[in-house]
Amino acid sequence: MNINVANLLNGNYILLLFVVLALGLCLGKLRLGSIQLGNAIGVLVVSLLLGQQHFAINTEALNLGFMLFIFCVGVEAGPNFFSIFFRDGKNYLMLALVMVGSAMILALGLGKLFGWDIGLTAGMLAGSMTSTPVLVGAGDTLRHTMANGSSLQQAQDNLSLGYALTYLIGLVSLILGARYLPKLQHQDLPTSAQQIARERGLDTDSQRKVYLPVIRAYRVGPELVAWADGKNLRELGIYRQTGCYIERIRRNGILANPDGDAVLQVGDEISLVGYPDAHSRLDPSFRNGKEVFDRDLLDMRIVTEEIVVKNSNAVGKRLSHLKLTDHGCFLNRVIRSQIEMPIDDNVVLNKGDVLQVSGDARRVKSVAEKIGFISIHSQVTDLLAFCSFFILGLMIGLITFQFSNFSFGIGNAAGLLLAGIMLGFLRANHPTFGYIPQGALNMVKEFGLMVFMAGVGLSAGGGINSSLGAVGGQMLISGLIVSLVPVVICFVFGAYVLRMNRALLFGAIMGARTCAPAMDIISDTARSNIPALGYAGTYAIANVLLTLAGSLIVILWPGILG
């Protein structure tokens, strides 16, 4: 049996789509040195090559892909988005605005200088910033502002061409900038990180190991009573000295949970909870007593839960204010916008932050009720909330403002982004509403993006040869300028106007570019994960601003030409 592959793919849009995705994802795993091509550029390259052979898919698949992607971006940004505006995120907001604004101005200027159309200009901006939200926002606005016809098709083709030509330039130049720019400035990055650590009491170990606490039991002997010297448990401060706390005491056969006024007596049997290394630091007077194996004394169900910060008595407060150890709980991680933060007693908690806490199940539940709620570990998505807010986003996108002879529509990109932010924000405040497992959200977001990239590549592939010869060199130079110059502008603005600590500043710059590989390099250079504080500060707002920049550059383009 002979199978004509070309006819088979042309006659089956779904098969063609998944062939493009599979080949593109394989290509995306290739590495150039230490740099991985990535899924987005892999799918785009494969779709452009197949597009040259006149393969095409239904444009509705492209539209659905970008809608799913941009909605999920909003959902991820929602929990921490508003804290950027209403609290101590002013510097991070200003840095993100400077980064996105300067890049957009440079792109508009270079587009006019070289005589490009809006498709090439917006595509170059998206590729240079390695930002698919720019590409999505620009593509949606093009469809809403240009009449269907050859001009719209040409602009959409050039949009994907500009992105494909400049993406690797933007990624490689930013990674090299992250590696060498810190060495060109006067302040040493590790020293800056240590300065923040001293000021805030931070743990600078970026590879902090996390263990579950363990429980062991001892019989109190004369040496331990002598060491206690008649002090009660509160006065002894055993946790401050050892990192362990006394969970239970058996005295005269009676098992009880001690309070701070309890005084140890010879013959008591005590259970201590702490990390393994904390047990090894116990005073010898503990270990000289006989270790006991009492089923009831050791019967404690240690759990690890993720607690979402929500309540007013925790939001805006320092981590030390929670006094988790006083409640018999251990803090393992602090996560903000899916970014692991340093364990810092002085860090100010935002609504939507996630604290990973270990301890006795009852104690962890009690702490969760005080500061927020335990994140649901369900694999079931609240599809009703997902679909309802998706519809709301589409309805918002239909809103059009009329100013004399000029009309401006919000568009699907901005509408879905806003609806996604609303859903994410409400999810961070109501534990049973709108739950979407992170794995499911990542899958929908990534799949939507890949479908969108496949669609734009197949649409643009037919005209790539003629366009590449005309603008290839201009694109490469422009991509380098738009990638690096805003980074330098942000550094100067942050260092000499905002006077930010360099470790936080470089982290914030990489967050404004939403580039995780460059962030890893900054952390390695600083020999600390302290730059993650700055990265988390700008990341959420930058994703939103980049989407809006894609729409705004299309709206402003006619005025630039005029």
Swiss-Prot record:
Pfam families: Asp-Al_Ex, TrkA_C. Keywords: Cell membrane, Membrane, Repeat, Transmembrane, Transmembrane helix, Transport. One of its GO terms (molecular function) is monoatomic cation transmembrane transporter activity. The chain crosses the membrane at residues 8-28, 37-57, 66-86, 94-114, 118-138, 158-178, 383-403, 406-426, 447-467, 475-495, 541-561. Gene3D superfamilies: Regulator of K+ conductance, C-terminal domain. PROSITE patterns: RCK_C. It is a multi-pass membrane protein. This is Putative transport protein YPO1326/y2857/YP_1266.
